[in-house]
Swiss-Prot record:
Transmembrane segments: none annotated. Belongs to the UPF0597 family. GO terms for molecular function: L-cysteine desulfhydrase activity. This is UPF0597 protein DVU_0440. One of its GO terms (biological process) is L-cysteine catabolic process to pyruvate. HAMAP family: UPF0597 (MF_01845).
Amino acid sequence: MDLALFFRNEVKPALGCTEPGAVAYAASIAARHCPGEPLSVALSLSLSMFKNGRDVGIPGTGGLRGNRLAAVLGVLAGDADKGLMALEHIDMAVVERAQTLLDAGMVTEEVVDGVPGVYAAVTLRCAGHEVTVTVAGRHDRVASIVVDGEVVGGEGMERAPEADGTLHGGASCEPSASFTKPPLPAYLEELRECDFAQLWDMAAGIDATLEQELLRGAAMNMAVARMGLESGWGLGVGHTLAAHAEAADLHARIRFMAGAAADVRMAGAPQPVMSSAGSGNHGITATVPVAVAAEGLGVSPRVQAEALALSHLVTGYLKAHTGRLTPICGCSVAAGAGAAAGIVKVLGGNAVQAERAVASLMASLMGMLCDGAKGSCGLKVATAAGEAYAAALLGMDDRGVQRPEGVVNPDIATTARALARLSREGFAAADAVMVELLGGGKH
């Protein structure tokens, strides 16, 4: 597998939550094709995009939240050339104007079925024109640009860009076109076919360039964690846990550092994090526990980099089975599993012990639901980080899950398939109910 390609696409900096970032990106493209004052903006979102963008802070807005605000900001001042960083340079004057338009009822938002988990269609109307820009499959993948009924750009619509080849829901929807089923990127197809020993060996074989990039990403996320400790952003999960922990307690430090980083990100701080599998919180969960363990135990930079590589590879492996956005909390079961494996590497363990740690982590957190990106994600990230360390200790003692336990199997491939099916079939109804509870009807 091309490791450089994997890390270039799956592990990269992100500013703010990726769901409203994708909405703002699409809206900024629409604005380019729709001259004049905006009259209305209509959002058609997948269930996952709706819940993950509904209540998360947007950087540069003073703590304001939501997909609808992101859309208006993208229309008014978004820079489409910056992709998911389209709102990087907005100022408070633009934010105030956007809030005025929101208060006037300019933006509507609805959840649609029959679309990929990553799906947002932004329809902008201005004097005499209507433009619809759709992102689908990945947060930065523009599937179509339609101006006054004519397709003028985009990579084409897909029926199932998710890793498992399925859709969320069954009905067709507007404004989407007919979908066709493409393959996963080749590097993810290859990753899906690996066994755990191969993941372990790939992590051990990273070159010097990847080593430095992985360490840079960990340093980026640790800086965000320290921000959370100092200032008590968001729910203050990390800040509060740290205030009541012994400084020498590595388990507690792993929990509060990871929680603090998620606090900062969910509150909308203008500070980038290194993401994993398309998610900043996945990136925090996959890196901060490993980095804290490496720092606390004094291992070499090379060992830390290999542990980080393993964490990202395990995270990517599991997400390649489940898809980008799922009803199950990916920070817990995917990135948390990656962190467990990475910590085993830091502790000096072997591949068998690391795979056992992955199984133990998943046995602990398999059923954790994703009810959207928001401040309380700091609690889930802190929990996943703490459980990752506990699972790693079990693995190092040759304990934990060693035979099938419920739906969890010591073999990562078997458990990944079970996780994908549970997420796709078992939790589909739960996802739909959550959207109703969150007010996901058109408004």
